[in-house]
Amino acid sequence: MNNTIKTDVLIAGCGCSGLYMAMNLPADKKILMITKSDCESSDSFLAQGGMCMLKCEEDYDSYFEDTMKAGHYENDKKSVEIMIRSSADVVKDLVDCGARFAREADGSLAYTREGAHSSNRIISVSYTHLTLPTNSRVQIS
């Protein structure tokens, strides 16, 4: 019996980061996503649709400190900087792909404060995993 699976790209993890990576790979690639248990056990699912976004430059230092503190200062500082600086572009990409984030009456993104964050920088959707598009070239196992 041959249990070999052939794929162009293997992604470990089926949370938002894994899905975002899959969405940004070339369309001709066959993608296999694997998870250690089930998709409903991912941190993205458990976060109930919330994700952080840098609202303005004045919030950067506080956002950076909150993230470092939440990671017990074991985080890679350059990775944290990249995550924070790219957050608005990631949100734009997700909106362009159909993610529906909560909005204020004027149409702007609605921000809340959760977890270790010292200010409102969490945007959310109900059940993020249901609003991020996938397609037939992505297999989740």
Residue ranges and their predicted role:
Residues 1-4:
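A short, basic/flexible loop-to-alpha-helix module at the beginning of a structural domain
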Residues 9-32:
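N-terminal Rossmann-like FAD-binding beta1-loop-alpha1 element of flavoenzymes
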Residues 28-45:
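Glycine-rich FAD pyrophosphate-binding loop
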Residues 44-45, 74-81, 91-109:
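A short alpha-helix-loop-beta-strand transition element characteristic
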Residues 53-82:
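Glycine-rich active-site loop/strand segments that organize a redox cofactor
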Residues 104-127:
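Terminal amphipathic helices with adjacent charged low-complexity linkers/tails
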Residues 128-134:
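Conserved small/polar residues in nucleotide/adenosyl-binding loops
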Residues 138-141:
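Hydrophobic alpha-helical segments, chiefly the membrane-spanning helices
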